[in-house]
C-alpha cells in the first residue's frame, strides 16, 4: 500500500494543499 499512497500524495497535495498537511502526518505515522 506504500506505493499506492505515494502515488496519491501528489494528487491530494495538488487538489487540496491544506489536506496535504494532514495526509503528510498520517503517512509519517503509517511508515513508522
From Swiss-Prot:
Residues 1-10, 18-32 form a propeptide. Disulfide bonds: none annotated. Processed by the macrocyclase-peptidase enzyme POPB to yield a toxic cyclic heptapeptide. POPB first removes 10 residues from the N-terminus. Conformational trapping of the remaining peptide forces the enzyme to release this intermediate rather than proceed to macrocyclization. The enzyme rebinds the remaining peptide in a different conformation and catalyzes macrocyclization of the N-terminal 7 residues. GO terms for molecular function: toxin activity. There is a cross-link at residues 11-17 (Cyclopeptide (Ala-Pro)). InterPro entries: Amanitin/phalloidin. Keywords: Toxin. Signal peptide: none annotated. NCBIfam families: amanitin (TIGR04309). Belongs to the MSDIN fungal toxin family. Probable toxin that belongs to the MSDIN-like toxin family responsible for a large number of food poisoning cases and deaths. This is MSDIN-like toxin proprotein 2. It comes from Amanita rimosa.
Amino acid at each position: 500500500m506504500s506505493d499506492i499512497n505515494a502515488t496519491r500524495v501528489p494528487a491530494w497535495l495538488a487538489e487540496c494543499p491544506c489536506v496535504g498537511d494532514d495526509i503528510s502526518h498520517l503517512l509519517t505515522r503509517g511508515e513508522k
